[in-house]
Amino acid sequence: TYTVQVKDANNCIVKKDYTVSQPTSLYLTLSKKAVSCFGGSDGAVNSLATGGTPPYSYKWMPGNISGQKLSNLQVGTYTVTVTDFKGCTLSSAITIDQPIALSLVTGSKNEICDAPNGKAFITVSGGTAPYTYSWPSLNIQQDTASGLHAGSYTVVVKDKNQCSASSTI
C-alpha cells in the first residue's frame, strides 16, 4: 500500500492510500487422450490456463499451432506455451502414448482320420484388453475353434479400442 499526499498553495493536504496488487500466478493444467491403436493418430491434448490476466493465447510445438486443444495427434511429446494479456508466459509438456501393437500367436491340431476333430487356437497380446474373436467362416466368437476339417481358417481379433489384427491358420 502506498500513500500519496498532496499539499496545495493554501496548505490544504489531501492523503489517499493506493494498493498495487499483483495478479495471481499463471497456472496451466494439461489433460490428454492416448492414441487408441498402435501407429494411430487419434490422440488429443487440452490445456486450461488460470491465474494471470485473461485472455490467454496458446501456442503448441511442434508445429507452431495456436489453440487451447489439439486433436488427431500421433504418439509424441507436445509442448504448449500460454501467454496472458500482460505478456506473462508459462510452458509445459505432455506426452501422448499408444498401446503396444496387437500380436497374434496361432496354433493348430490337425484332424485325424478324416474326421472333423481338428482345432485352431490363438493367443493375443498387446492392444488393450479385453479382446473379441471372430472366425468369419465358422461363426465362432472365441479364441479356439474346434471340430474342424483340414483347411485354412481366418480369425479376426479386436481389442477394447476396436483395433484389429487377423491371421490365417
Task: Name these PLM-found stretches.
Residues 1-169:
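Proline- and Ser/Thr-rich low-complexity, intrinsically disordered segments
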